[in-house]
Every structure is written in structure tokens, then in C-alpha cells.
């Protein structure tokens, strides 16, 4: 599998937390999300790229489950300045 590129951009017009572009292997994620929501969105969109045949309901359930597990075990985004 080729690398997935992640691009942060405000997605207010799209009314979305994130978007996955399967053909280009690009995830767009709205950076205005708080910690756990950001993590869940990142996982959710990556699942869309990894498993394009998976239904939205399944992607949502599985991404929520994985995000909850990682969050419970203190996985966080570190911002380097």
C-alpha cells in the first residue's frame, strides 16, 4: 500500500470533519476538532481508504471503537512548535 497523505484544511463548506480521496490516497481533515474527535476522524477517513467496500455504518462503528481504545490508553496528538 502506498503512503496516505494527510492535509489539514477547514471543511465548513463541506459540512464534514474529514474526507477521504481513495484514488489519490489523500485524507483531508478539519484541524479545528478537539483531540479525541480529531483522532476518530483520522481513523475513520483512513478506514475509507483501506477498506473502500466497507459501509459508512461499519466504518463509523470500527473507527469509534479504535479511537476509544487508543484514547483510553492515552494516545494523543503531540504538537511540535
List each language-model region with its residue ranges.
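Walker B catalytic acidic pair
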Residues: 45
Amino acid at each position: 500500500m502506498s503512503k496516505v497523505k494527510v492535509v489539514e484544511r477547514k471543511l465548513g463548506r463541506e459540512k464534514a470533519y474529514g474526507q477521504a480521496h481513495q484514488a489519490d490516497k489523500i485524507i483531508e481533515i478539519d484541524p479545528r476538532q478537539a483531540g479525541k474527535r480529531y483522532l476518530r476522524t483520522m481513523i475513520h477517513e483512513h478506514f475509507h481508504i483501506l477498506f473502500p467496500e466497507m459501509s459508512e455504518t461499519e466504518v463509523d462503528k470500527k473507527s469509534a471503537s479504535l479511537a476509544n481504545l487508543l484514547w483510553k490508553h492515552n494516545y494523543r496528538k503531540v504538537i511540535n512548535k
